[in-house]
């Protein structure tokens, strides 16, 4: 896998999860970049990261619109999109899946499995 693909883009505003993702990415041998602006994400996604992680509740970043744009463009084929949300948000989960999110998880499950998810995307396992 080319070096440029061993990158994580994370679209979130939560400091706790920013640190958690950065730590897990480091342990998986991946670089991580935090993005808060939709336009900035589309530019950075052109570098074809392995995975883009979305806090589906970060409304300022327009996660559903971004997911649909990314999945609708052949330029981003092969980039995995993962979203997390509260376990009680069934409608948002369905909307994210319909927009093209590859994996939608409850925040607790995402947190618990983050290390394994990133290792898988880094090519370690």
What is the role of each PLM region?
Residues 88-103:
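Alpha4 helix (beta4-alpha4-beta5 surface) of REC/receiver domains from two-component response regulators
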Residues 15-33:
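Two-component/phosphorelay signaling modules centered on CheY-like receiver
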Residues 1-7, 22, 117-125:
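Non-catalytic signal-transmission and effector/linker regions of two-component phosphorelay proteins
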Residues 6-15:
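Conserved acidic segment of CheY-like receiver
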Residues 75-80:
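His-Asp phosphorelay/catalytic-motif detector in bacterial-type signaling
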């Amino acid at each position: 896998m080319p070096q440029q693909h061993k990158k994580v883009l994370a679209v979130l505003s939560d400091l706790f999860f920013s640190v958690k993702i950065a730590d897990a990415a480091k342990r998986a041998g991946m670089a991580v970049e935090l993005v808060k602006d939709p336009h900035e994400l589309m530019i950075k996604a052109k570098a074809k990261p392995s995975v883009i992680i979305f806090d589906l509740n970060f409304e300022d970043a327009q996660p559903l619109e971004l997911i649909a744009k990314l999945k609708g463009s052949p330029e981003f084929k092969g980039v995995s999109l993962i979203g997390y949300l509260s376990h009680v948000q069934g409608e948002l989960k369905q909307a994210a899946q319909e927009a093209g999110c590859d994996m939608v998880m409850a925040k607790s499950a995402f947190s618990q499995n983050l290390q394994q998810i990133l290792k898988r995307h880094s090519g370690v396992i």
